[in-house]
Amino acid sequence: MRSTFLLAISLLLGLISSAQTPCESGFAGIYPCSGYDLQSRLTMAQIGGGSGNDIWGWTSSTGREFAIMGRSSGTSFVEITNPAFPVYLGNLPSHTSNSTWRDIKVHNDHAYIVSEASGHGMQVFELSRLLTVTSPPVTFTEDAHYAGFGSAHNIVIDEASGYAYGVGTNTFSGGLHFVNIQNPAVPVAAGGFSEDGYTHDAQVVVYNGPDAAYVG
């Protein structure tokens, strides 16, 4: 019995090891590479299905690492602390309908998720919940929701001030939509900017240069 168990373990380890693909002659399997190996791969079907368009990440205070994948029907969470053994933890379904576009940013251990799905708004998910998943995969629920806009192409966060900026929303002519996220449980509308029209993406910083008229 013991020898059978050891044989099974050996076969399993052999299968797992085969998932790691070394970078040889500029390729790790079918993927171009330069000085790094392919540690593992999960298909879209293995992490909730549909198509994917955005990926972000989060590292816990204890050093555990997670990938956050925006998909057409929801958001997937995958632990990648050991990159050779990724674990699909679960899915946060779309707040409304499916959409090709779903984007994520992370601030203070929370994920902020927007989509071009009509009426979707901004989902808020407390990432520390990932640390206690014991029987994956699970279906998550959002911890908070902001409905000040419906659809949005992307979201930008200024970590210094604790403000999020929806871009390409159905408000402010598609310009910047400001949201105070200093309390992630209660996102608060803080205005917007429409003079430049539709904004596809952005980077937000607090100006601290020589021109006093623009400081702050």
Question: Which role does the model predict for each range below?
Answer:
Residues M1-T4:
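Positively charged n-region of N-terminal signal peptides that target proteins for export
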Residues L6-G14:
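Bacterial N-terminal signal peptides
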Residues A19-G216:
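Feature marking well-ordered beta-strand scaffolds used for ligand recognition
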